[in-house]
Amino acid sequence: MKATIIFLLLAQVSWAGPFQQRGLFDFMLEDEASGIGPEDRAPDMPDLELLGPVCPFRCQCHLRVVQCSDLGLDKVPKDLPPDTTLLDLQNNKITEIKDGDFKNLKNLHTLILVNNKISKISPGAFTPLLKLERLYLSKNHLKELPEKMPKTLQELRAHENEITKVRKAVFNGLNQMIVVELGTNPLKSSGIENGAFQGMKKLSYIRIADTNITTIPQGLPPSLTELHLEGNKITKVDASSLKGLNNLAKLGLSFNSISAVDNGTLANTPHLRELHLDNNKLIRVPGGLAEHKYIQVVYLHNNNISAVGSNDFCPPGYNTKKASYSGVSLFSNPVQYWEIQPSTFRCVYVRSAIQLGNYK
């Protein structure tokens, strides 16, 4: 009888599947549960590579996303999984990005370093990131943009830093770049090198808002579709500053000190659809609106406009070749709404699209 029981037990063991160790932490926990100490274990340790990548201490890892945000880290964690595609390090206390911090992260697509204390980035820190597309550096202490950014980069956001210079060299070879965000930096016009953005052939969106620039940056790429320069100290819009921007669809110049827009400026942006010039010091409606074929939204509220001509917005008669306006704002200007001829807005899509009001 005893022999029969032993035989059945041996058979059951032989039918069981092979033991599979799930991870290093499982291995350690099983030791604790069983009371087995190092002296009781065979001297051969498991190959760590077979156990798979280990998530950095206190971070969370899931589906090639490594989240190490809000941990009070003062440096980039070591031994990041090499298959990581998104690394989130925001809201920490990192002060410096060093060479080797991102070694072996050849598959990283997105790097989030927002809201740290970074003041220095080594020139070769991003060199290993051969597939990086999105780099978020906002809310740090950078005085310049990093050098040798990956040529695969498509989106760079570095607002709310201490950047005073934008050199053309930092963007050399970045032919895939689409979005550049540099708002809320102590930038001056003299700090932006002429043609700094010109080499980026696919650049579509630039935002340099809430800085100290007094002019529109020169040498902007013709691929640009949106230009946001709100909240600066620009005093005038020269026709030459927008020359060649044939694809520009949205121009944001709100909250500046603009008193004049040169004649011919709008002719240099033939596909413009939205023009934001509210909260400036304009004394008249910019010229060229009536002749512009595609423009549909014009914000001119909170200016010093004292008169509006009957042909300021629409061409004489009813020109069906011009797109109808879907939004025109003129409130908070000295001009009284009853002084404006009803025919002035003959090319507006609906009357509700017109915003008029008394001057305060």
UniProtKB/Swiss-Prot annotation:
The keyword Transport does not apply. Its main location: secreted. The attached glycosaminoglycan chain can be either chondroitin sulfate or dermatan sulfate depending upon the tissue of origin. It holds the Pfam family LRR_8. LRR repeats lie at residues 74-94, 95-118, 119-142, 143-163, 164-187, 188-213, 214-234, 235-258, 259-282, 283-305, 306-335, 336-360. The lineage of its organism: Eukaryota, Metazoa, Chordata, Craniata, Vertebrata. One of its GO terms (cellular component) is extracellular space. GO terms for biological process: negative regulation of angiogenesis; negative regulation of endothelial cell migration; negative regulation of vascular endothelial growth factor signaling pathway; positive regulation of macroautophagy; positive regulation of mitochondrial depolarization; positive regulation of mitochondrial fission; positive regulation of phosphatidylinositol 3-kinase/protein kinase B signal transduction; positive regulation of transcription by RNA polymerase II. The gene is DCN. Glycans are attached at residues 34, 212, 263, 304. This is Decorin. Residues 17-30 form a propeptide. May affect the rate of fibrils formation.
